[in-house]
Amino acid sequence: MTFRFDNSYARDLEGFYVDWPAAPVPAPRLLRLNRPLAEELGLDPDLLEREGAEIFSGRRLPEGAHPLAQAYAGHQFGGFSPQLGDGRALLIGEITDRAGRRRDLQLKGSGRTPFSRGADGKAALGPVLREYLVGEAMHGLGIPTTRALAAVATGEPLLRQEGERPGAILTRVAASHIRVGTFQFFAARSDIERVRRLADYAIARHYPELASAPEPYLAFYEAVAEAQAQLVARWMLVGFIHGVMNTDNMTISGETIDYGPCAFMEGYDPGTVFSSIDLQGRYAYGNQPFILAWNLARLGEALLPLLDADAERAADKANSVLETVGARYQGHWLAGMRAKLGLSGAEEGDARLAEDLLEAMRSQRADWTLTFRRLADAVTDEGALRPLFRDGSALEAWLPRWRDRLAPDAAQRMRATNPIYIARNHRVEEALAAAHAGDLAPFDRLLEALAEPFTERADRELFALPAPEGFDDSYRTFCGT
């Protein structure tokens, strides 16, 4: 099968990676192929159904593939690790999709590499299917994200903390896998020339219009800050908690990446944490905008030598970008909140209107997704909201203020903005448990609902229901390594 690889990272950035083969697997079996994505990439899904097990397990890579493990560093929970890198993944190449966009193809769970740091480099079935589900859920919501092209069972049992688990490999598609941590890897070694080469490559690949800017590296820093501010605002608007916002998990492209301990919040609480390793709540839902700025500061540090030869002027330029991050984020968040509330135009009091609703939701632990979805029904029937609030009077003072700001077509616009289906934690776990038992039908049904999150259907009612009371209080997510 022809993939038409054009591997610019391997060609242009020698010394930024290690050439490495995928580990052999005993009995690969294609579990699921993302046929719409395959077509988007210009690939033949029928042919991939037949040959995908061999290709996406790494046993028989297509002609032109160049498997490599990328080097990067990163701050993990605030502590700097100078060498991380692809410890269980291989970039096999780049292709151009039907829209003319360059896309990475990466095998995740393909075995040990020089960056594995003692781990086995493999992935278990549960984390692979989880990333497939949540990535497609984010795509359905219109949020920039890496996506899964395929999931392959390897036929190899893996020993994990919870016991023996079947092995699997995910084929991940991304605009690129360049991270803040990629810049940090070379900056930490004072290899300014490679930082410059990486910046030039990232500009050419993701922000080519900046190449002719008076100060292209400063413009690049601003562009990444803008892309990430918009991304995190969109996470917040749907109640998404990434769970591990380390700098090696922040992309230069502005795509969401790495869905290990992520989860969607149900009852609204800014302090919500699901990750089993986030013991201090560093990456709690409400902290994500602050971590956004913190991570961008680390990128700024790596770029300082490119911003100006004078250290003081370079710091001033970096700070001039950092000082805008809060306003960038708030602007995207408020624009999104106006859409979620169905407001007409923009007025000064809109932020307060939104914040007062959130405070009422917090005090009642109201379901994030259903509250905003049922607000569309409340345009004509305020009773639609009452089941979501323990205290029926919680919104009495707020509703008239909201009604005064509604657009004429508010209900229709709100239903197109506020999803009815998200990847609720209990439904994801049910689908994964069934998959472990050999039944992928629940996975498929959930995936179908998540692909159309704004379209409410009677036969998908179960996917809209919150978890049983108390479920999320004890629910914990894991990295899957």
UniProtKB/Swiss-Prot annotation:
This is Protein nucleotidyltransferase YdiU. The keyword Transferase applies. InterPro entries: SelO. The gene is ydiU. The keyword Metal-binding applies. Belongs to the SELO family. It comes from Cereibacter sphaeroides (strain ATCC 17029 / ATH 2.4.9). Mg(2+) binds at residues 249, 258. Keywords: ATP-binding, Magnesium, Manganese, Metal-binding, Nucleotide-binding, Nucleotidyltransferase, Transferase. Nucleotidyltransferase involved in the post-translational modification of proteins. It can catalyze the addition of adenosine monophosphate (AMP) or uridine monophosphate (UMP) to a protein, resulting in modifications known as AMPylation and UMPylation. It comes from the Bacteria. ATP binds at residues 85, 87-88, 108, 120-121, 172, 179, 258. Its cofactor is Mg(2+); Mn(2+). It is an enzyme of class 2 (transferase). GO terms for molecular function: AMPylase activity; ATP binding; magnesium ion binding. The active site is at residue 248. It catalyses: L-seryl-[protein] + ATP = 3-O-(5'-adenylyl)-L-seryl-[protein] + diphosphate; L-threonyl-[protein] + ATP = 3-O-(5'-adenylyl)-L-threonyl-[protein] + diphosphate; L-tyrosyl-[protein] + ATP = O-(5'-adenylyl)-L-tyrosyl-[protein] + diphosphate; L-histidyl-[protein] + UTP = N(tele)-(5'-uridylyl)-L-histidyl-[protein] + diphosphate. Its EC number is 2.7.7.-, 2.7.7.108.
